[in-house]
């Protein structure tokens, strides 16, 4: 297991220690669970509230689900997600799996997204259903893209976000990342 970061607040500015074996998603989630916050609200959206315990399970399921789809350490996934629980789930799940999330603004053009897909060499696109039309013309000829995962659905024959969660594991060990590995 990776170690957690530490901060010495007795000095100004605080001295931060990030250990060699480090995974940012593991640090964020485990720090809150260890502090007894599993039942505390971590994320609030129109559809409901999610506790740190619920977020931890979603992160585990999504990270392991991405690995089950063949995504591996240092592969990239492009995230074009609106402000729902699926964003922190995908972002942190990818990081915990050692996969690099490339989060993009949801107000861009298809041309902008085309550049980002090619430049990042994303192997998967994780997209909110209402943004899928912006990506539709880009998908057939993309040389690196292997998977399209749609939040709030599974439109047009693409994989549904909820299915990746359902097939993932509730317990999932973090990838053996280090403090100087690419993270996002």
Label the model's feature ranges:
Residues 48-50, 65-110:
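Conserved AMP-binding/adenylate-forming
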Residues 29-32, 55, 59, 66, ...:
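Adenylate-forming
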Residues 27-54, 69, 153-156, 182:
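AMP-dependent adenylate-forming
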Residues 102, 126, 147-149:
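Hydrophobic/aromatic beta-strand patches that form the interior of the parallel beta-sheet core
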Residues 106-138:
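Conserved ATP-dependent adenylate/AMP-binding module captured primarily in the ANL superfamily
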Residues 1-22:
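Flexible, non-catalytic linker and terminal segments flanking ANL/adenylate-forming cores
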Residues 130-183:
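ANL superfamily adenylate-forming
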């Amino acid at each position: 297991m990776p170690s957690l970061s530490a901060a010495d607040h007795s000095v100004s500015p605080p001295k931060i220690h990030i250990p060699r074996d480090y995974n940012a998603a593991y640090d964020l989630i485990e720090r809150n669970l260890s502090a007894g916050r599993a039942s505390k609200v971590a994320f609030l959206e129109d559809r409901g509230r999610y506790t740190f315990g619920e977020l931890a399970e979603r992160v585990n399921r999504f990270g392991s689900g991405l690995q089950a789809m063949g995504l591996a350490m240092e592969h990239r996934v492009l995230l074009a997600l609106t402000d729902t629980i699926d964003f922190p789930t995908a972002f942190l799940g990818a990081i915990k799996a050692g996969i690099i999330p490339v989060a993009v603004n949801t107000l861009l053009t298809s041309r902008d997204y085309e550049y980002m897909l090619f430049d990042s060499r994303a192997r998967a696109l994780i997209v909110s259903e209402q943004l899928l039309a912006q990506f539709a013309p880009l998908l057939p000829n993309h040389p690196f893209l292997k998977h399209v995962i749609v939040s709030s659905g599974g439109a047009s024959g693409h994989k549904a976000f909820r299915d990746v969660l359902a097939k993932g594991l509730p317990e999932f060990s973090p990838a053996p990342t280090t403090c100087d590995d690419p993270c996002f």
